[in-house]
């Protein structure tokens, strides 16, 4: 069966501002008439994401609103109950979307109240069927929703009652990044993300056993005139910068090495830790890694960096070895680079580029704590 939408722009207009020429028709090939509406819905979603790429912050999330349009984004990976959350909690709140919360720079939201894709069981097996918000008796979509809070959902059958708490900002960033679409295409993407996450004092974590028990917690965040922004964590933005690479390469950090940062796309620092976005990969740096990265803004000797660590974090009987080890991890991860070393012969960069990397996915010694693909969902 060929399912064609000859006026995709009109279908998207309710959720995406009509600020450009009409999109070309969407055509979806499907051999199953039951699955065809889901396939069409998915195609429209992908086109909507493409239209806002590089402009809007897009969460893979449920959007539910209060009476004045104050909207909470409930973020979680696919297959973990977001549609169930929308169908249950949306009966008492406004339904904005169950797929993609599209957040503009002023935190207004382009509503996308698509039909809900609900998994059903029949003789064929698991299928996804489209159910309208009206059929599910969800609340009306507000005309001008705006983001007021971002909540990471985490189902835990051992939790006796729902627990809504503030997340450390760095934890929230790393939890939400995999559930964004085309984040690196935004200008200063991590700063844009942090501004959204910190609304109402967030980001928030909601741990629960059954989503129907969470209505009060979610509704409280949408209540009119709620202002928790004063509780938001303080964070520092370090905009990306292009750094020159020396013609020669040193791979091993020694006490005579001179180091500085490599090119990075964006970075934020909070509570002594940081997230550095480089080559579309976010790396979380602990206090030690962050202090070294911040200190290496300009070319610095290992001795200078060591002294900075002692001054900011404190002394340690093995501080020199710990700093050398941490610097090596940061160099291996290409977060820092050695630009000179008078006591080590360099390797030509083209020869170094041919050597296999041994760093991907490394977790080490209080320096680089985690790395993951920042654009795992949509490029």
Predicted regions and their residues:
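Short helix-to-turn junction characteristic of helix-turn-helix DNA-binding domains
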Residues: 295-300
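A noncatalytic interaction/capping subdomain that flanks phosphate/NTP-handling catalytic cores
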Residues: 1-78, 91-92, 102-290, 294, ...
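Acidic/polar hotspots within intrinsically disordered regions
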Residues: 366, 373-375
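Conserved lysine of the Walker
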Residues: 82
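GT-A fold catalytic core of metal-dependent nucleotide-sugar glycosyltransferases
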Residues: 93-97
């Amino acid at each position: 069966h060929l399912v064609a939408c000859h006026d995709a722009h009109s279908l998207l207009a309710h959720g995406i501002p009509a600020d450009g020429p009409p999109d070309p028709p969407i055509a979806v090939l499907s051999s199953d008439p039951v699955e065809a509406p889901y396939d069409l819905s998915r195609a429209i979603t992908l086109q909507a994401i493409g239209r806002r790429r590089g402009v809007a912050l897009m969460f893979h999330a449920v959007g539910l609103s209060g009476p004045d349009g104050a909207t909470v984004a409930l973020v979680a990976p696919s297959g973990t109950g977001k549609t169930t959350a929308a169908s249950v909690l949306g009966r008492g709140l406004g339904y904005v979307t169950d797929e993609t919360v599209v957040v503009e720079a002023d935190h207004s939201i382009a509503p996308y109240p698509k039909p809900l894709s609900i998994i059903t069981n029949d003789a064929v097996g698991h299928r996804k069927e489209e159910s309208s918000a009206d059929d599910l008796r969800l609340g009306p979509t507000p005309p001008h929703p705006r983001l007021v809070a971002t909540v990471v959902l985490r189902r835990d059958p051992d939790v006796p009652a729902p627990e809504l708490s503030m997340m450390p900002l760095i934890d929230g960033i790393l939890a939400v990044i995999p559930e964004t679409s085309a984040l690196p295409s935004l200008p200063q993407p991590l700063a844009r993300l942090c501004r959204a996450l910190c609304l109402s004092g967030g980001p928030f974590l909601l741990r629960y056993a059954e989503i129907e028990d969470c209505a009060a917690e979610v509704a409280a965040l949408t209540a009119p005139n709620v202002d928790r922004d004063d509780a938001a964590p303080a964070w520092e933005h370090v905009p990306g910068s292009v750094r020159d690479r020396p013609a020669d390469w040193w791979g091993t950090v020694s006490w005579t090495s001179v180091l500085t940062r490599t090119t990075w796309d964006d970075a934020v620092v909070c509570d002594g830790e940081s997230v550095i976005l480089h080559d579309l990969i976010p790396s979380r740096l602990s206090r030690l890694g962050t202090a070294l990265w911040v200190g290496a803004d300009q070319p610095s000797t290992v001795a200078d960096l060591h002294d900075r660590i002692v001054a900011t974090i404190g002394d340690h009987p093995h501080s020199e070895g710990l700093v050398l080890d941490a610097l090596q991890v940061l160099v291996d991860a290409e977060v820092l680079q050695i630009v000179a070393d008078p006591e080590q012969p360099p390797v030509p960069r083209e020869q170094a580029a041919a050597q296999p990397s041994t760093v991907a996915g490394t977790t080490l010694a209080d320096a680089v704590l985690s790395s993951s693909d920042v654009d795992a969902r949509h490029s």
